[in-house]
Amino acid sequence: MRSVIEPDHSIQLNEAIYCYDICTNDFAYNLIAVAFRKHLSLLLVGLPEESGEFGYTRLQDMDLGEKEQRSVSALAFSPDTSLNCTPNNVTLCAANGSQLKLYRTDLGQFTSLQVLRGHGDYVNDVSWVCDGELLASVSDDFTCRFWTTTGGGENVITFGLSSAGMSVKSHPEDPNKVLVAEKKGIIHLYNVTLKQTVISVESPKFPLMSADWAHSNRLFITSLAGGDVVTWDLNRPYVPADVKQVHEDCGRVVRFAPGSSEMVIAMVIGLTLKVFAAKSTVPLLEASLKSYGGMAWHQRLPYISAVSDRKLLFWKVQMK
């Protein structure tokens, strides 16, 4: 175990970062989307384990529109995003106020924008589900909505919630199920094909601010609610497998590490990044941030990243 204050690598940008996403696809896993006040930027990062040194390239900027007053709250790359084809194929959804903005680009000649409207309030999270056939979104309007993105784009399913929707997640091994987390602490696994809830669990505390679904084991889900990180094993869903009290503050985001054999969880509490092995109360890593603009794991290499004002910071985590 080690505690780290300073990041191993950083990207200095010219404006404050509102949120970002690192692509998880096999053919674009170093692609990063960054949201600023009025535009998005696509970056390609190089990590020392692959390219010998750390660096990045700014590939393209995309305008959010002058009229938009709300900042981007979530970003998600579609599963068919690839930099290993000709032409390149990048599809990115940005949650911008109550709208979903769908950008498609080949990073060269062609860029298009499609706007999906239907939510009545701020969208908190977006995720591609059903192997990329549908886009899912959750909002302060107490709904989870599913959208087709071909043609004009259509809201084909609406799943009513009892409080604001905070997180929506898919799983590569179970593409027809979606994790939907509500602010009052209820987490549903929803079968999109059957249009019904399969199982629900409830956090002992609320408000719930974030939830995630472990890619390394689809039976494990976690939430950050009321200052606790609560993890469930869905084989025994009625009692949490682990409750970790991390702070009186309710926190901001929680994420499982994608490739670790043991459950490793990262979170941002206030302006502190913490990484824990699931059963441990001693952090593997702890670092201070100047502002909050998101947090994400790299899909292939053991790096956790987070925003601090105008910087995107990377820490290497020692994991099993």
From Swiss-Prot:
Q: Which PROSITE patterns match?
A: WD_REPEATS_2, WD_REPEATS_REGION
Instruction: Name the predominant localization.
Output: nucleus
Is Acetylation found in the keyword set? no
Enumerate the InterPro entries for this protein: NUP37, WD40/YVTN_repeat-like_dom_sf, WD40_repeat_dom_sf, WD40_rpt
Where does the UniProt annotation locate this protein? Nucleus, Nuclear pore complex
For biological process, the GO terms are: mRNA transport; protein transport
The answer to keyword Repeat applying to this record is yes
Effect of deleting the gene: (Microbial infection) After infection with E.chaffeensis, results in reduced bacterial replication rate and increased survival.
Keywords, A to Z, come to: mRNA transport, Nuclear pore complex, Nucleus, Protein transport, Repeat, Translocation, Transport, WD repeat
What does the protein in this record do? As part of the nuclear pore complex (NPC), has a role in its assembly and function. (Microbial infection) Required for optimal replication of E.chaffeensis.
Entry protein name: Nucleoporin Nup37
